[in-house]
Amino acid sequence: MSLKSVLFFASLALGHVIQPRSFSCQSPQLTQEQIDIAEEMSIKEKSMRKSGMTIQATISVDVWLHAISASESGLSSDSALQNQFDTLQKTFSPYNINLNYAGKTKTVNAQWANEGNGQEMPMKKALRRGNYQSMNVYIVDVLPTASGYCYYPTNAPEGSDNFYIDGCTLAKSAMGLIAAHEAGHWLGLAHTFDGNNCDGPGDYVDDTPAQSGPSSGCPASRDSCPNHPGTDPIHNYMDYTSPDCWTEFTPGQIDRVNSQWNRYRA
């Protein structure tokens, strides 16, 4: 998105991820159609909760990791890829979102390794695996303006551009919990501060407190909307706080993930 944080580049050592303390996300803004659908989902979810019903069920996701680099030596190691999957799995398993490591690919291609070269679609058409329920994560050398991004779920018949463009892209230096933030978008979640307006709908999820804009670092008790209930959700994976500050999705966010999954990916 247009909102940017400072990216402190990390490195990989012995296959272990060293996590940047802040980042920038380039996931696209919600379209008007996606906003309208989010509003519809919010109404339905609220009605179900009032009736004592739950929309939540077990979701199973095959995960494909694709390492792309300009050189053989620049490719992410098998252990780094395994660590990345393990981080995703650990993040989502408490919410009945079960991830399966379906496989990996490794590709040396200087054009694809730099996202600034405009080769996203050719790369994804060549590398994508699985169906629309499969999360494909592309790990590249360079993302010129961001740490990562994912596409929101949408109508995507197999073989269509929407089908191929789907997935998540990460700079290799941003591997780790940042992938969990981006995967939240792939599952249908917006930023908690979406709209940057205390009085707006925000992320269209009822139980994430109002937030005037993105947080950074890990600012205890930050309250950017003091006239609204709750303090800013600094521990939420969908804020811009430091990844080591993240610990949670809300029940309402998991309702939304299920609504999005049932509509687009089930």
Where are the model-predicted features located?
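Fungal secretory targeting signals
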Residues: M1-P20
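Soluble non-cytosolic domains of exported or imported proteins
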Residues: L75-N83, A174, I178, D232, ...
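Short, histidine-centered active-site or binding-site loop motifs used for metal coordination
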Residues: L65-S69, A174, T241-S242
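Sequence contexts marking disulfide-bonded cysteines in secreted/extracellular proteins
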Residues: S24-P28, Y149-Y151, G167-T169, D199, ...
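Metalloprotease/metallohydrolase-associated module, dominated by Zn2+-dependent proteases
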Residues: E158-S160, V205-A266
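Propeptide-to-catalytic entry region of secreted or membrane-anchored zinc metalloproteases
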Residues: H16-M135, I139-L143, N262-R265
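Metzincin-family zinc-dependent endopeptidase catalytic domain
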Residues: N83-S216
